[in-house]
Swiss-Prot record:
An example molecular function term from Gene Ontology annotations: structural constituent of ribosome
InterPro entries in alphabetical order: Ribosomal_bS16 (IPR000307), Ribosomal_bS16_CS (IPR020592), Ribosomal_bS16_dom_sf (IPR023803)
Record family assignment: Belongs to the bacterial ribosomal protein bS16 family.
Stated name of the protein: Small ribosomal subunit protein bS16
Stretch list, region Disordered: 87-131
UniProt xrefs under Gene3D superfamilies: 3.30.1320.10
Biological processes, Gene Ontology terms: translation
Length: 131
């Protein structure tokens, strides 16, 4: 299977990446089939060979997550919601709902406690005024 991935090069702590097409079983910095672009995360510079990328994608090459995000930013791929993101979003919605319920319960409990304290204070005041 052909993968579109980032190949690291540059100095230590000054990494840049080449976007390459390579066999999925080859090493990260091994010899690629084709170089398709360049990405520098420090300067946010990106150069993509759009024709070659479209050709590789039409042939069935699978981009890695990092490459997919670069291609989405470059407009070569439509932004897709992956199943993991859907699961994360649904869990977040469930958490928000449960937090809202618990906060509502806590508010009610606090109000009831405050009302009970007021009733107890008024009873003690009445008892002290009668005595």
């Amino acid at each position: 299977m052909i993968k579109l991935r980032l190949k690291r090069f540059g100095k230590k702590r000054e990494a840049s990446f080449r976007l390459v097409a390579c066999n999925s079983t080859s090493r990260r910095d091994g010899r690629p089939l084709q170089e398709l672009g360049f990405y520098n995360p420090r300067t946010k510079e990106t150069r993509l060979d759009t024709e070659a990328l479209r050709l590789r994608l039409s042939q069935g090459a699978q981009p890695t997550d990092a490459v997919r995000s670069l291609l989405e930013k470059g407009g070569l791929l439509e932004k897709t919601i992956r199943p993991a993101e859907l699961i994360g979003k649904s869990k977040q919605e469930e958490l928000r709902k449960s937090e809202a319920k618990t906060s509502a319960k806590n508010k009610k409990a606090n109000e009831e406690k405050a009302n009970e304290e007021k009733v107890e204070e008024s009873e003690t005041l009445e008892a002290s005024s009668e005595a």
